């Protein structure tokens, strides 16, 4: 595709925001002209894979209308194909007649979400009275799915829009399916309004109120072993119009992945620390406070003070802004991924909300070195790419299998609704370049691959992989070959014979799913990318080095030099274990920071087998 713009650090990029080894380095960003997509809905698009390597795309809609079986206005749509592009093609070529269109749905699709929405644990607890102008007390959407490596169960985040109260509120609950989406259950509440969910028909409210936390965006962080959930709240005037998106706050909470999103595992980021909060009384709003996170150009601390409180602050929303007590966060509705080229987290916010609601606005990118103590700095602004979309997500443009996970030097960012060239939906590909990037062929950094238990990855003279424990006479040279695009090849060759190099990846696979399934056997092959750099065998031979971070609740973190190697194609980790049977000693496994102790574990790998040192 033809590149239509270039941004250079020092003009539209501040050098302070870049991951650079010296002050002379610059980051440039080129991006393509927008290309249309057809999967658009009233949410971002979410992508994940199950234990068989099957790819799923899902999105959601919950219109303020009565349910009809003849449309998808109250549906969680699921599709399956080789990857996102396959789903996009299915939708593009499908019939406009809904009875025919439904035939391309995956069985996980929920056609009528109303019974789920109006009978959640939160609805049963707070018992909304209902509002005459609305058909239902709650409109809800499924936002992201994570697959439990112990059971294969699906867990997801539910965005609630509660119209049964006056005024309305947002909230977040947890959903679960134990049969790949055939049946869903809303199991418990994660987040409401920290100031309570008061109905003005029952008790007096102040001049403004907190709308509650919703619109969750999930990031699964393999570095720290935490789920990070970014979510948005609003400050609204109780009387009169304050602008639906005029006074938005951004927050983040986190929970250990091992806790499987259970309510009592979450902590909110507040004043630079991760604090526990009350998860018992939903009507009290899960009372823990959460800071409004902002970029460092607004506050060097990374969050705004003073903290909004409707019980102690007087004035309308605009008056509170004028008093310096409220700010519309520039990070509202952010999507987050790890950029392995920059070695930083990258975020894309919704661009145009604010007190003036001016419509289309340039797209901005922010980066932070840490999520433990986030300091989001603006990396650059695409001044000629203007949209107003809330619904964004990022993907690796080669794999196209996981949303908002790991991206590299080139990545794809999607826009749904109110986009630049194709109003309904589009994407652009962005390519970054660091001026300090080597212009010569990368050298191999020799290393030994040893896991936390002391197992060492080796190979015999016929390039058959073996795993030994303790000292070994390894006659092979092992190393990491930096592709300089955010990805590595794991390579091996007989000592002194680099011309006989082999590459580590999935070699025995008949289909795309086989390359991506849990337990896929890993082997060595010659020149996997020679024929087709976009092929599964090439992508499965590429790895991301993710350093392990011990993240503390006080906002500090420690790196001990250990790391995981994450497969580019599948998002699974390299796992090797000398205690396993021979054909399962070197495999791909889902992320683990804990061991499954049941006899029915779907994935039986151990956490130590994927932590390298």
At which residue positions do the language-model features occur?
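Bacterial N-terminal signal peptides that target proteins for export
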Residues: 1-9
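Bacterial N-terminal signal peptides
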Residues: 9-18
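Beta-rich carbohydrate-recognition and catalytic domains
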Residues: 25-138, 147-154, 158-203, 222-225, ...
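Beta-propeller and closely related beta-sheet repeat lectin domains
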Residues: 43-46, 139-146, 214-217, 332-335, ...
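Short, flexible beta-strand-to-coil junctions
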Residues: 51-52, 59-66, 161-163, 222, ...
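Sequence contexts marking disulfide-bonded cysteines in secreted/extracellular proteins
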Residues: 116-118, 168, 414-420, 528-532, ...
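Short aromatic loop motif centered on NTY/YTY
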Residues: 201-218, 389-411, 561
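Extracellular glycan-recognition/adhesion modules and their associated mucin-like linkers
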Residues: 438-463, 474-517, 533-581, 600-613
């Amino acid at each position: 595709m033809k590149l239509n713009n270039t941004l250079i650090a020092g003009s539209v990029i501040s050098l302070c925001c870049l991951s650079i080894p010296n002050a002379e380095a610059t980051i440039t960003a080129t991006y393509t002209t927008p290309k249309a997509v057809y999967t658009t809905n009233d949410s971002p698009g979410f992508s994940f894979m199950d234990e068989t390597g099957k790819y799923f795309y899902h999105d959601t809609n919950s219109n303020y209308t009565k349910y009809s079986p003849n449309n998808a206005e109250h549906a969680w749509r699921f599709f399956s194909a080789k990857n996102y592009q396959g789903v996009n093609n299915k939708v593009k070529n499908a019939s406009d007649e809904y009875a025919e269109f439904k035939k391309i749905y995956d069985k996980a699709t929920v056609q009528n979400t109303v019974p789920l929405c109006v009978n959640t644990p939160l609805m049963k607890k707070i018992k909304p009275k209902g509002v005459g102008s609305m058909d239902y007390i709650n409109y809800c959407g499924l936002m992201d799915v994570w697959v439990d490596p112990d059971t294969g169960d699906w867990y997801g985040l539910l965005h609630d829009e509660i119209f049964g109260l006056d005024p309305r509120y947002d909230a977040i609950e947890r959903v679960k399916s134990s049969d790949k989406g055939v049946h869903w259950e809303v199991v418990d509440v994660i987040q409401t309004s920290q100031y309570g969910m008061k109905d003005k028909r029952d008790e007096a409210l102040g001049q403004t109120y907190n709308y509650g936390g919703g619109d969750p965006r999930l990031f699964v962080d393999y570095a720290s072993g935490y789920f990070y959930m970014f979510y948005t709240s609003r400050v609204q005037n109780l009387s009169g119009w304050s602008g639906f998106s005029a006074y938005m706050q951004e927050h983040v909470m986190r929970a250990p992945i091992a806790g499987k999103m259970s309510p009592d595992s979450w902590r909110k980021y507040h004043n630079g620390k991760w604090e526990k909060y009350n998860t018992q009384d939903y009507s009290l709003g899960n009372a823990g406070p959460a800071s409004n996170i902002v970029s460092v150009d607004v506050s060097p601390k990374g969050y705004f003070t003073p903290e909004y409180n409707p019980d102690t602050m007087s004035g309308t929303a605009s008056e509170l802004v004028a008093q310096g007590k409220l700010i519309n966060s520039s990070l509202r509705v952010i999507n987050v991924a790890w950029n392995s080229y920059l070695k930083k987290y990258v975020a894309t916010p919704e661009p145009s909300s604010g007190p003036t609601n001016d419509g289309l606005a340039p797209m901005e990118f922010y980066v932070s070195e840490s999520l433990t103590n986030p300091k989001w700095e603006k990396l650059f602004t695409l001044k000629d790419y203007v949209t107003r979309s809330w619904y964004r997500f990022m993907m690796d443009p080669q794999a196209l299998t996981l949303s908002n996970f790991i991206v590299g030097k080139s990545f794809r960012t999607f826009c749904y609704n109110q986009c630049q060239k194709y109003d309904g939906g589009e994407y652009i590909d962005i390519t970054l370049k660091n001026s300090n990037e080597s212009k010569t062929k990368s050298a191999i950094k020799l290393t030994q691959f040893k896991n936390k238990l002391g197992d060492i990855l080796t190979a015999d003279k016929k390039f058959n992989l073996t795993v030994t424990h303790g000292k070994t006479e390894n006659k092979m040279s092992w190393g990491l070959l930096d592709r300089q695009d955010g990805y590595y090849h794991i390579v091996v060759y007989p000592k002194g014979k680099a011309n006989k190099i082999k590459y580590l990846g999935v070699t025995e696979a008949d289909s795309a799913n086989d390359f991506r399934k849990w337990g896929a056997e890993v082997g060595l092959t010659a020149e996997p990318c020679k024929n087709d750099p976009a092929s599964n065998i090439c992508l499965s031979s590429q790895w991301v080095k993710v350093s392990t971070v011990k993240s503390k609740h006080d906002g500090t973190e420690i790196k001990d030099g250990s790391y995981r190697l994450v497969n580019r194609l599948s998002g699974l980790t390299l796992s090797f274990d000398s205690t396993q049977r021979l054909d399962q000693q070197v495999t791909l496994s889902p992320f683990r920071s804990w061991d499954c102790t049941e006899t029915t574990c779907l994935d039986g790998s151990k956490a130590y087998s994927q932590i390298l040192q």
